Amino acid sequence: MIAPNFPRSSIPSPAKLICLLLCFAQLATLVPQTHAQKTTAQPTLEISVGANNTLVIPKSALGKEHLLSVSRIPQALAATSTGLSGKIVRFELFADGVDLYESTEGLVVTKDLPARRLMTTFPIVEQDGTKVVIDFNRGMRRLYTDIWYDASRRFDPVGRDETLEIPQARVFSATKQDNQIVIRQSVQVRNRQFSSNLEQQFEVRYFLTPYVSGGYSGKEAPASDLRYARFFESQAQLEESTGRSSPKMARFDLSKPVVFHYSANTPADYVQAVKDGILYWNRAFGTNIVRAEKAPDGVTAPDPRYNIVQWVPWDAAGSAYADILIDPRTGESRHGQAYMTSVFALSGKARARALLRAMRDLAAEKADGKKDKHDAFGGWPATGGVCEVNMAEFAAQYAQGLQELLANDGLTDEAALLASQDYVREVVAHEVGHIMGLRHNFAGSLAATLDLKELDDWFKAYVAGDKLDAYTNRYASSSIMEYTVFKAAVQVGWFIRTQPEALPHDKAAIQWGYFNSESPREGRLLFGTDDQVGTYGDLQRFDVGADPVVAAYSQMSDNIRLLPNNVIETFIAAKAPRDPRDRVPLAEVNLWPTRDAISISGQFSSMLGWFNQNARSLRVEQPFDFIGDLNQKNRAEAHWKSLNDQVERLGGVDRAFFSFLPVDLKLDLKEAPKGVGAAEKVSATNLLARLKTLLAAPAYTNFVGLDEKRYSFTPEEKELILKRGQSLFEDLEKELVKQACVRLETVKRDLGGEVADSVAEDDITAKLEQRIIDLAKLVLTAKDDGKRLKGKVDKSIVEVLDFKYDDETRLAAAKALNDNTGSFKGWATDAKGDLNKQLKDDMEGALNIGNFKDFKDSMLSRTLREWYMKQQEILKLLPPKAGQPPK
């Protein structure tokens, strides 16, 4: 609406004035009302810094409230910060020292009963009639461990008082910056309960500023809205008399611009990407409230004067991360910092290969059971913040994304750089979103408007430099606060760079948190954060797509397709590492079929998991007004329908669950998958042929190494790669069958029965279980003409044709027919009985057992006796049919 425009010479009549006022009143209702409040004037800091980093406290400042904010900074790996919970404190003078007390406001239910919360006592260095000088270093020998935000929304009187001991410390710097004192203390930290012999090194940075109440009132998020959006919140405080816990949302005061400074060491290639990631949030606010400026040289995070996006040169980092220092009473965000690590920066193909090697090593290290090192802070990771991720998960998905990028024949250094710039845009916007208060939204992928095939097509066109007009206003996630896989993150970064709007959930969440909009609830927007990841199967970190079964199938397909590329990249990393000291002779390069099989079968297991009645989907359950026993049946029906729809999209049970296995089953593969590429069958012959083709392709005949130099494989090296690849693919065939059988042993399939109250004869569960029986029969009975065992039965020499699959695989196949995981208890009874008879007859015939009146296994020679005992172990898992006569 446009306000009336009067000529300068005209003087409106009273009636016109009333009309004008009404128009402006109406206009005001159309403009979003910010939560910005007129802040009370900040009092001047009276405390100053004295000689030798002491604090000089005027006696007029004693008893006055101050805000003490704290960041702890590890002194290993990267010196990045994690904010701890701020405290409102006051100084009080006694004869032998100056006490520091925490305010009891919000920590006790009544002021009628006196309470004092002593934090520490500082030794007095000197004093006179107007001031007292204290030794901050000697007094501050305990470090409170509660972090700046709270996830529980409940008042925790114990957790907020947990401390660590500081046996050694040195305040090496104390300065007054603007209206704050910044104290930097180097400490050794010890946990008195756990790891008492471990003393970790940290810098503890204290920020002390005068505090006055009443200028900014915080906001408590309505609990009923948290299903649709959520902000970080302060540690909960108690309301007087009622004792009700009340956390406050972490938000900036919008009465002034929110300025972010990107650090001066940000590489020139990424400055614009970082700025774009910061300024993205203006689209969500609907106004240019957020600004991006370069930080002065020498300024690094955390700094109380700036919100900083700090570039961290760290190629092996597990993520980027952020945190905020907030007012513990109101939730007002005072300043925040995001740490943007160089792991996201790909300046070209060589850099991509170097990062691929680093991510593979990191993922392999975690897969081998080497857990993250934790510090003494009750298990907090050594680098922390609100975006701490599982490093193995991050490394695995990033390695997969880099591999897919490098697999593009037309990839140029320019395309790799552009992809990394868009990746940085996405990551910076994500971290700045945290600083603005937003929590993760791992449901962003569930509201994607690109299906998996469209995302693949977009990525290929993007790398090739083709036009992308067909993807305007399409996105792989509805929220920047999602953890997306590499190509989806690049797509979202491209969206930020090319589209004028914010992603839907980002805008709705900001409008809800800062302007009291009800759009998240009204639109029933999909939202799920960290503490819900274990509740919903489709709420995962680093997933992609709206349908979890289809997404897992797509991921499995990618894993299989890229196997030959993985082989070549492994040899490239050995031949041309980033540092020549890391070069490995190609003959010593190892490949891991078990690891590849576990990766592929992991996605297979994820797909099967949706047959379990306890599996829950956020996307399926979001339309329900409530979640409970009263609508359990309705929700199960919705889950069953979703599962059937996804299996149908994949071309049916045979296509979805068995077509990739390297076995000869009679499958119905008439229907092709819709919206996703078909997973190819794992075949050593086909994979070896593709490996040979790739070695002859331009991308690998003359390639850029990790050190940015040009290399080629010699004919002898190519022959070695092909032989090693052939061994890998042949072993992978066998290992994948075993891993698939292992997964089938533990995955329940009772959802269909929960919906129908009875077991159907031809639904997808029945079809799945019939194929499980077929697979088990094949694995248990298949013979290998090249494997023959010779030995004696009593005095007779016999030759036994051995089975194709090893004993461990056959045992797994037999266990896959167990009663506990099927749609009903006796689902495989007949099949097990038939197998028992077939295997028993085969074994007894091979050993001529029928010729002996009283056969004993002691009559067998060593080789045959071992074989016989293993068959007996399998037969125990396959009970004979009732009434079947024993032999």
Q: Predicted segment positions?
A:
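Catalytic Zn2+-binding segment of zinc metalloproteases
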Residues: 432-448
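Auxiliary tRNA-acceptor-end handling modules of aminoacyl-tRNA synthetases
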Residues: 38-266, 295-415, 424
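Conserved catalytic/binding loops enriched for acidic/polar residues
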Residues: 384, 388, 407, 411-415, ...
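N-terminal secretory signal peptides that target proteins for export/translocation
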Residues: 1-14
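Boundary at the C-terminal end of the N-terminal hydrophobic targeting segment
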Residues: 27-41
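Zn2+-dependent metallopeptidase catalytic core
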Residues: 60-63, 68, 72-73, 267-291
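Bacterial N-terminal signal peptides
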Residues: 18-29
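Short alpha-helix carrying the canonical HExxH Zn2+-binding catalytic motif
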Residues: 420-436
